[in-house]
Amino acid sequence: MPNWGGGAKCGACEKTVYHAEEIQCNGRSFHKTCFHCMACRKALDSTTVAAHESEIYCKVCYGRRYGPKGIGFGQGAGCLSTDTGEHLGLQFQQSPKPARAATTSNPSKFSAKFGESEKCPRCGKSVYAAEKVMGGGKPWHKTCFRCAICGKSLESTNVTDKDGELYCKVCYAKNFGPTGIGFGGLTQQVEKKE
């Protein structure tokens, strides 16, 4: 049957796909609304699609159907499975939970609930994950992550530490770097012997 002025046929629903709603995969056209995994019906995009002949799948379902199988072939990183192997005649044994260590009493309700947080070396206040920057092996607030001399904001590429304090590379070189002739800034006057 001729296709008079219409677009290609959708690989899922077989209806006409017009250019504005078309997604192409593996030489076939799909409506944006039809571009779903044929197994789990999860919506797909160019980064999550895996094609097999004329069928499209999400990467997880594709791996289950067409990936390697057997003992030693995991489903890959990021895939959780509740398969215990009973269908293979394997016995699932849950490992015993380790005994919890005795905890000391903590006066703060927040500390007891969420654990003690680390302290910022500059201001001495608690550093929480959302504001944490690591420097010199210690946690800092983003606002405290500055050069101790000039106050310039630091990044991982321009930070140096000495004796637990942070410095930008310029201040570190001026204050702790080598001195004398041939090392940039002449800090001592050289006396001429006559």
UniProtKB/Swiss-Prot annotation:
<dbReference type="GO" id="GO:0045662">
    <property type="term" value="P:negative regulation of myoblast differentiation"/>
</dbReference>
<dbReference type="GO" id="GO:0042805">
    <property type="term" value="F:actinin binding"/>
</dbReference>
<dbReference type="GO" id="GO:0005654">
    <property type="term" value="C:nucleoplasm"/>
</dbReference>
<dbReference type="GO" id="GO:0043426">
    <property type="term" value="F:MRF binding"/>
</dbReference>
<dbReference type="InterPro" id="IPR001781">
    <property type="entry name" value="Znf_LIM"/>
</dbReference>
<keyword id="KW-0221">Differentiation</keyword>
<dbReference type="GO" id="GO:0046716">
    <property type="term" value="P:muscle cell cellular homeostasis"/>
</dbReference>
<feature type="short sequence motif" description="Nuclear localization signal">
    <location>
        <begin position="64"/>
        <end position="69"/>
    </location>
</feature>
<keyword id="KW-0804">Transcription</keyword>
<dbReference type="GO" id="GO:0060048">
    <property type="term" value="P:cardiac muscle contraction"/>
</dbReference>
<dbReference type="GO" id="GO:0033365">
    <property type="term" value="P:protein localization to organelle"/>
</dbReference>
<dbReference type="GO" id="GO:0045944">
    <property type="term" value="P:positive regulation of transcription by RNA polymerase II"/>
</dbReference>
<dbReference type="GO" id="GO:0008307">
    <property type="term" value="F:structural constituent of muscle"/>
</dbReference>
<keyword id="KW-0862">Zinc</keyword>
<keyword id="KW-0440">LIM domain</keyword>
<feature type="modified residue" description="Phosphoserine">
    <location>
        <position position="95"/>
    </location>
</feature>
<dbReference type="GO" id="GO:0045663">
    <property type="term" value="P:positive regulation of myoblast differentiation"/>
</dbReference>
<dbReference type="GO" id="GO:1903076">
    <property type="term" value="P:regulation of protein localization to plasma membrane"/>
</dbReference>
<dbReference type="GO" id="GO:0005737">
    <property type="term" value="C:cytoplasm"/>
</dbReference>
<dbReference type="GO" id="GO:0030018">
    <property type="term" value="C:Z disc"/>
</dbReference>
<dbReference type="GO" id="GO:0003779">
    <property type="term" value="F:actin binding"/>
</dbReference>
<protein>
    <recommendedName>
        <fullName>Cysteine and glycine-rich protein 3</fullName>
    </recommendedName>
</protein>
<keyword id="KW-0805">Transcription regulation</keyword>
<comment type="subunit">
    <text>Self-associates. Oligomeric in the cytoplasm and monomeric in the nucleus. Homooligomers preferentially form along the actin cytoskeleton. Interacts with TCAP. Interacts with LDHD, MYOD1, MYOG, ACTN2, NRAP, MYF6. Interacts (via N-terminus)D with GLRX3 (via C-terminus) and PPP3CA; GLRX3 and calcineurin compete for interaction with CSRP3. Interacts with CFL2; the stoichiometry influences F-actin depolymerization and possibly two molecules of CFL2 can interact with one molecule of CSRP3 resulting in the highest functional impact; the interaction is stronger with phosphorylated CFL2.</text>
</comment>
<dbReference type="GO" id="GO:0046872">
    <property type="term" value="F:metal ion binding"/>
</dbReference>
<feature type="domain" description="LIM zinc-binding 1">
    <location>
        <begin position="10"/>
        <end position="61"/>
    </location>
</feature>
<feature type="modified residue" description="Phosphoserine">
    <location>
        <position position="111"/>
    </location>
</feature>
<dbReference type="GO" id="GO:0061629">
    <property type="term" value="F:RNA polymerase II-specific DNA-binding transcription factor binding"/>
</dbReference>
<dbReference type="GO" id="GO:0033292">
    <property type="term" value="P:T-tubule organization"/>
</dbReference>
<dbReference type="GO" id="GO:0010831">
    <property type="term" value="P:positive regulation of myotube differentiation"/>
</dbReference>
<dbReference type="GO" id="GO:0003300">
    <property type="term" value="P:cardiac muscle hypertrophy"/>
</dbReference>
<keyword id="KW-0597">Phosphoprotein</keyword>
<comment type="function">
    <text>Positive regulator of myogenesis. Acts as a cofactor for myogenic bHLH transcription factors such as MYOD1, and probably MYOG and MYF6. Enhances the DNA-binding activity of the MYOD1:TCF3 isoform E47 complex and may promote formation of a functional MYOD1:TCF3 isoform E47:MEF2A complex involved in myogenesis. Plays a crucial and specific role in the organization of cytosolic structures in cardiomyocytes. Could play a role in mechanical stretch sensing. May be a scaffold protein that promotes the assembly of interacting proteins at Z-line structures.</text>
</comment>
<keyword id="KW-0009">Actin-binding</keyword>
<dbReference type="GO" id="GO:0006874">
    <property type="term" value="P:intracellular calcium ion homeostasis"/>
</dbReference>
<dbReference type="GO" id="GO:0008286">
    <property type="term" value="P:insulin receptor signaling pathway"/>
</dbReference>
<keyword id="KW-0963">Cytoplasm</keyword>
<dbReference type="GO" id="GO:0031433">
    <property type="term" value="F:telethonin binding"/>
</dbReference>
<keyword id="KW-0217">Developmental protein</keyword>
<dbReference type="GO" id="GO:0007517">
    <property type="term" value="P:muscle organ development"/>
</dbReference>
<dbReference type="GO" id="GO:0141212">
    <property type="term" value="P:phospholipase C/protein kinase C signal transduction"/>
</dbReference>
<feature type="domain" description="LIM zinc-binding 2">
    <location>
        <begin position="120"/>
        <end position="171"/>
    </location>
</feature>
